[in-house]
Amino acid sequence: MRILFLHPNSPDYLCASLFHGLREIYGTNCVDLPRFDCMYAPIKRGVLNKIRGHGFTLYGLLEDIPELEEERFFIWQKNIAAFDLYIIADIWNSWRMLDQLLEHVDTRKILIVDSGDTNRFFPWNNLKTSWRGIWRKRKLLKHCLGYAKREIPARWSEAVGPAMQLLPNSLYKSLLPEKILPISFGIPGSKISYITPAQKTQRFTTHIVDADIASVLHHNKHTESYAFTNEQDYYADIQKSMYGITTKRSGWDCLRHYEFAANGAVLCFQDLNKKPAMSAPHGLNESNSICYTNFTDLENKLNAIAEKDYEKLLQNSYRWIEQHTTAAVAQRLIASIHPTLPKD
């Protein structure tokens, strides 16, 4: 299968992880348009420092494929219709490319990826746009192969925003794409490091995103920025930690969950039980993570974990992250739409 991956060429963790997985699986049969500059090695430190999180984990990993330069050149005029699947990554910033693409290819070959942290679906997030404009954008999605999204709310009314709250419940779903597909972040398989409990020297990672817990553990840092500027130091700190504190921030899913698990820190996830079932991360439960509400609750739960129980938690955490490599996430997404791809 040949895939054309259309994107706005700006850092986005979901688009980056999906493209990394697709390129790992399909090689030269996955063409990025335009060239996804920050994904390729070598990448300069100044570029990484402009990316949220200093570009840890996902950026500057891929080997460039010079022959794809010829394929990209004049592609809209010469060979735009030569692919089996078209992925519009980051629909909020790429909808104009979708509009252009629909002039050339079958709608049923187009997969939409919504990488936004909001649980609103395109185009319902910005209702300052005229209703005519919103309706036109919504029609762009009609009959597309699928709409992949991380943050999927429990109630469809939340997907369209407060301006539409007066509609009957039965109409909400009609405002959304026909086929909604869950998707999550992923982590390159090469970033998984297998650490044993015996190698642990501290209970928690240095940087803690839960301000209340960080304030109790005075030696731990809570900031809105990152505690490390070097990926190697960041990973080393995780690897010597038994647990990593994580929470919902802009959205439920974030790369931190996967970085912690890949480096051997069992996730302690605040209010995980409140996460909508279809929202990422998927597959976390009491067998591979700790759900807590506050510091007292967390302390009580951790104190009740025996050494052998922690070892089992860690094993299950590794099983979970092995199912959420970039390649595994990409493979599941393709499998979910492959039977419905039109045959030429």
Language-model segments: residues:
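Nucleotide-sugar donor-binding catalytic core of glycosyltransferases
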Residues: 2-286, 327-332, 336, 340
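Conserved acidic donor-binding segment of nucleotide-sugar-dependent glycosyltransferases
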Residues: 285-295, 304-307
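A charged, aromatic-enriched C-terminal amphipathic alpha-helix characteristic of glycosyltransferases
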Residues: 307-341
